[in-house]
Amino acid sequence: MMKFKKSFVITSLALSIFSASIMTTAVAANVIPTQTQQASIRYDQSMDIFHPIYAKNGMVATEQALATQVGLDILKQGGNAVDAAVAVGFALAVVLPNAGNIGGGGFMVVYDAKTKQSVALDFREMAPLKATRDMYLDQDGNVVDGRSLFTHLAIGVPGTVAGMEHALKKWGTMSLAQVIAPSIELADKGFVVSETLGQTLETEKDNLAKWQDSKRIFFKNDAPFTVGDLLVQKDLAKSLQLIAQQGGKAFYEGEIAQKIVTEMEKHGGLITLEDMKNYRAIERKPIEGEYRGYKIVTMPPPSSGGIHLVQILNILERYPLQEFGQNSAKAIRHYAEAMKLAYADRSEYLGDPDFVQIPVTGLISKKYAGELATTITTDTIRPSSEIKPGKPHPYESDQTTHYSIMDKDGNAVAVTYTLNLNFGSGIVAEGTGILLNNEMDDFSAKPGTPNAFGLIGGDANAVAAQKRPLSSMTPTIVMKDDKPWLVTGSPGGARIITTVLQSIVNTIDYGMNPAEAIMVPRVHHQWLPDEIRIEEGISPDTINILQEEGYKVVPKATMGKVQIIQAREDGFYGASDPRNPDGLTLGY
């Protein structure tokens, strides 16, 4: 095998993509033509090794079996996909307390079958009014270790309750009391701790033990709950009951708001009653792209996920991936080169669109993808340092959760939400049972300095009052013939984008059913560090070829936990990622 030589041709990515003339005629002339072919989508029980769940009327896929059952019950009772999504959102706050939440925030992409419109709902946490750019720096201008993570200054104004209530009022058919009722019962009567949750509690015990209410809920006899224990959350049940009775006002203006603010005042936090009262979920126009005839509908900023998902797909569309073969060296090579280019742009342009100008049109344009594609050659690889100078972004963890829902009427919902780290700040607002996020760490505490996940940010993501921090969450709906065809998403920090990408490519390019599409090994490249990360299961021969071409290939832990549903003429096919044994897909 001939060893590929690295190219040292420097191509600036700092393009003038704010203007309509992002591509010059000369460059456009060299654009690689788009490949429009796609694999035939099939499901054959006699041929497929992995088999999806099938249902005729509706389907729910989440990371926790009890939450999945809650969502399915809502569908069976006559609720639509949004009713079920809101019910699942509250249920996960009980049964997946490390990531599911009402003290955090996230994003939702909804397809409303009545209006035939897609909407992106932003309920990301927001910086308090008293937040300042330098609030995490000492007098010498250095970042104070842990201040943006495990103190009351780490907590952003929560958005989940506002987001869920907004969605239910706008697109749902049931009352808040109806959809929250199962969660109240789960919190009040308790549920059995799984091995996965028990391990997470053990890992995070030191942070939880610092706070009296957190320890009271998640510990017994000075040790965290373990597998088989019954976890009862009476205070959380009372808070959920207040929200069910009074709506979002209970959380943002009433008794719960007062308790959260009292918690802040006792410990030097910044959130005030004014902050709570002012919070609003925001409807945004989704990012839309096209890939081999399918329409990609995904989340816009302050998520970076949607833009760069479409950007990478635009680049890959120019290559016959089906001919390359799934997870072949040639396919992985093209994934890696496209991923590098997109992640370099991620570091430069993304932030809260209400505060910074983002060149969305340019970043997701086919022409821009064409120019980027011309830098990918068949006989050389470009080192990341030659794409754009910068500092590395080490990998983020899976401390987020995603769920997908489709119903018999053609509605579809994709939700990704989080507390940031496992159990967020570890702080429970006294008397509420509500874990509070540490999402303020997702801002750039100091441009050029990494956050908890090692992500380097710039001025576009600097701390500012009432600003929402940048995210990688990528809830996505794929449309075929103007109808929802695939709902997908995943946790995984910076790896969310590439995980969702591969779930889409595996179904469209390789014709995999949903179970196959999410069970095969994944790869990831995020520009810096300059390495291809792989899961176990990639062929040693493939690894050798990539290494001979000049790539650094690094086996790592599993990436993402996809929850995926596909709509076909005969019903729904779905699957929950086996990387989380607690996940479950159900339908009826």
Each model region followed by its residue ranges:
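Bacterial N-terminal signal peptides
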Residues: S12-I22
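Alpha-helical support elements that line or immediately flank enzyme active sites
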Residues: I74-L75, A162-K170, Q246-E253, Q258, ...
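Extended C-terminal subregions enriched in glycine
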Residues: K467, D509-A557
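Internal maturation/activation junctions in enzymes
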Residues: R318-T418, G431-T432, P447-G448
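Short beta-strand scaffold segments in enzyme catalytic cores
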Residues: G105-D112, T401-I405, P475-I477, K561-A567
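Active-site rim segments in enzyme catalytic domains, especially the processed small/beta chain
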Residues: V94-A120, L270-T272, A412-K480, Y510, ...
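Bacterial N-terminal signal peptides that target proteins for export
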Residues: M2-S12
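Noncatalytic scaffold domains of N-terminal-nucleophile
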Residues: N30-Q69, A81-V82, V86-G247, F251-E253, ...
